């Protein structure tokens, strides 16, 4: 879609939602909405919780810019509704969104594509699990299968702390992933227009890049480009693109890795709707890696909006 064509559209920026990441989504959505208004586009901010279809009809939305995070926004649900309503939207389609949001199924897809993933086990709510039952030793990372922004994530170093970590993760999901803890650089690759645009390194003040570090100013150092030898820098970008393709993603995403001292790149996850706040990583990668201002990034994503039925994503 050209800029002139986009000018003719009434854009609904979908934000808020019902997930544990609601507050972050509101920040992302308002940043996108303000950028669209500043460029002269017909944008309306929509806090979608219930009656989404009714809101979209009443507002006469021609195009949806999805700034939702977490359940119902990032997992294929809203994408399916928009497909049914024949409203073009930004980002990946139903299947790719659902796969990326589900950490177990996405890991299986990554492994099938030959990408390196962290060793893992799963635990269902109601099952008892102790450290001796795990196929690898402590420390481990415990996380809900379907949450983002590190919600419900705990690093467990002592056997007696495992059950509390599982209980915390079970607050958000009935299936929990237990991953072997891998020490390495936290590196995140930006994908835009289905191509890698750079890799940034995160050095959190906390033990890992948790919710506080992601959304509180000064809680993490961002280093661009990531401090990797050039061959390794190119390797992690290429693997980011492979992960994007393995899930059938469309347009843009952010791919998270742990890179060890010996050059192994452990793929953690693909974020199909990465944050678009002032502290978010994709806008920073786009600015430093591709020379795109925040407004230019928003415009490019909006112009890529489409229906995906019949496509891979």
From Swiss-Prot:
One of its GO terms (cellular component) is cytoplasm. Disulfide bonds: none annotated. GO terms for biological process: cell wall organization; peptidoglycan biosynthetic process; regulation of cell shape. Mg(2+) 2 binds at residues 269, 271. InterPro entries: ATP-grasp, ATP_grasp_subdomain_1, D-Ala_lig_Van_CS, D_ala_D_ala, Dala_Dala_lig_C, Dala_Dala_lig_N, PreATP-grasp_dom_sf. Mg(2+) 1 binds at residues 256, 269. GO terms for molecular function: ATP binding; D-alanine-D-alanine ligase activity; metal ion binding. It comes from the Bacteria. Its main location: cytoplasm. Keywords: ATP-binding, Cell shape, Cell wall biogenesis/degradation, Cytoplasm, Ligase, Magnesium, Manganese, Metal-binding, Nucleotide-binding, Peptidoglycan synthesis. Binds 2 magnesium or manganese ions per subunit. It catalyses: 2 D-alanine + ATP = D-alanyl-D-alanine + ADP + phosphate + H(+). Gene3D superfamilies: 3.40.50.20, ATP-grasp fold, A domain, ATP-grasp fold, B domain. Residues 107-303 form the ATP-grasp domain. It is an enzyme of class 6 (ligase). Pathway: Cell wall biogenesis; peptidoglycan biosynthesis. It is found in: Cytoplasm. Its EC number is 6.3.2.4. ATP binds at residues 135-188. Its cofactor is Mg(2+); Mn(2+). Belongs to the D-alanine--D-alanine ligase family. Cell wall formation. This is D-alanine--D-alanine ligase. It comes from Trichlorobacter lovleyi (strain ATCC BAA-1151 / DSM 17278 / SZ) (Geobacter lovleyi). The lineage of its organism: Bacteria, Pseudomonadati, Thermodesulfobacteriota, Desulfuromonadia, Geobacterales. The gene is ddl.
């Amino acid at each position: 879609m050209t800029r002139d064509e986009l000018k003719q559209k009434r854009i609904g920026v979908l934000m808020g939602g019902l997930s544990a990441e609601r507050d972050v989504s509101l920040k992302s959505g308002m940043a996108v909405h303000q950028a669209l208004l500043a460029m002269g586009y017909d944008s309306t901010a929509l806090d979608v919780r219930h009656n989404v279809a009714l809101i979209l009809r009443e507002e006469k939305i021609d195009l949806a810019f999805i700034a939702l995070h977490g359940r119902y926004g990032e997992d294929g649900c809203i994408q399916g509704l928009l497909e049914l309503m024949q409203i073009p939207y930004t980002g990946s389609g139903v299947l790719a969104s659902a796969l990326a949001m589900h950490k177990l199924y996405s890991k299986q897809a990554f492994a099938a594509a030959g990408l390196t993933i962290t060793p893992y086990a799963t635990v269902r709510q109601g099952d008892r699990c102790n450290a001796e039952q795990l196929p690898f030793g402590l420390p481990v990372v415990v996380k809900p299968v379907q949450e983002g922004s590190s919600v419900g994530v705990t690093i467990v170093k002592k056997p007696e702390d495992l059950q509390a970590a599982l209980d915390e993760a079970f607050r958000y999901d009935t299936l929990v992933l237990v991953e072997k803890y891998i020490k390495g650089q936290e590196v995140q690759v930006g994908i835009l227009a289905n191509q890698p645009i750079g890799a940034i390194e995160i050095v959190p003040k906390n033990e890992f890049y948790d919710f506080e570090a992601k959304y509180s100013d000064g809680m993490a150092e961002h280093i661009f480009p990531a401090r990797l030898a050039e061959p390794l820098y190119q390797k992690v970008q290429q693997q980011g693109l492979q992960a994007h393709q393995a899930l059938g993603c469309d347009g843009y995403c952010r791919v998270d890795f742990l890179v060890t001292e010996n050059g192994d790149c452990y793929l953690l996850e693909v974020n199909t709707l990465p944050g678009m706040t002032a502290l978010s990583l994709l806008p920073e990668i786009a600015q430093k890696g591709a020379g795109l201002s925040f407004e230019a990034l928003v415009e490019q994503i909006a112009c890529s909006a489409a229906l995906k039925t019949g496509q891979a994503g």
